[in-house]
Design a protein with these regions (language model features):
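Acidic catalytic/metal-coordinating carboxylates
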Residues: 37-40, 63-66
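The feature encodes the CheY-like receiver
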Residues: 60-61, 88
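C-terminal output helix
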Residues: 90, 108-117
Length: 122
């Protein structure tokens, strides 16, 4: 993978953030930040400049699909993958239209998360 890729994890669930962090960390990624909502995500993105963002869809405040749009406005090259418990076609389409590269449905297998991360960075 070369130089370790920096990741920002965005999810309102501490358990989910911890699980994603554990999987990515043991596979060579460096988790540089975690956010519980969209506002924190946008603030941290500007400061941390991560290579990859994992984004939940349903969180307090703005939906993840709107946050993706904001991140892409800040950085047209922002690489975002959605990790969500919702597998609704309209949300998948909206996330992709707003700039997400991959959509992983919870619960997920470790391999699925890692494959999506690699494709998003691709």
């Amino acid at each position: 993978m070369g130089e370790a890729k920096k990741v920002l994890i965005v999810d309102d669930s501490l358990v989910m953030r911890s699980m994603i962090k554990e999987i990515l960390s043991k596979n060579g990624y460096v988790v540089v930040g975690q956010a519980r909502n969209g506002k924190e995500a946008v603030d941290l993105y500007g400061t941390l400049k991560p290579d990859l963002v994992t984004m939940d869809v349903i969180m307090p405040g703005e939906q993840g699909t709107e946050v993706i749009k904001k991140l892409r406005a800040l950085d047209g090259n922002a690489r975002v993958m959605v990790v969500s418990g919702l597998n609704q076609k309209n949300l998948v389409i909206q996330a992709m239209e707003n700039g997400a590269k991959e959509y992983v449905v919870k619960p997920f297998e470790e391999k699925d998360l890692l494959d999506a991360a690699m494709k998003t960075l691709g």
